[in-house]
Amino acid sequence: MPLIPKQAVGAKIVGWGTALPEKIITNDDLSKTMDTSDAWIRERTGIERRHVGGSTASLSIESGRKAIEMAGIDPLSIDALVLSTTTPDRTVPATSAAVQHGLGLR
């Protein structure tokens, strides 16, 4: 006997999207204001540049719109939104509420 009834519907990923802030700060940029160098940072972290700016909500909305477009679905057909971050825009209301509104979800 199966653990999940045949009529139960599972979750699936049918689209995905990405977003990065446009502003880029390189290691050379950092070395102009800090006692460091591109080589020192690369050797220890492997980082060459970082994208900075933009809110968690705005980047989530941008990537969410791309995912919805890729999936070819109506945003109102989405039953759940899961947003996990260590960098929320604020604690209350939750960033997920802003993303839900920005994507036009129920």
Segments predicted by a language model, with ranges:
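N-terminal Rossmann-like NAD(P) cofactor-binding module of classical short-chain dehydrogenase/reductase
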Residues: 82
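Conserved active-site "lid/cap" helical segment
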Residues: 1-79
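Conserved catalytic cysteine-centered active-site region
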Residues: 40-58, 85-106
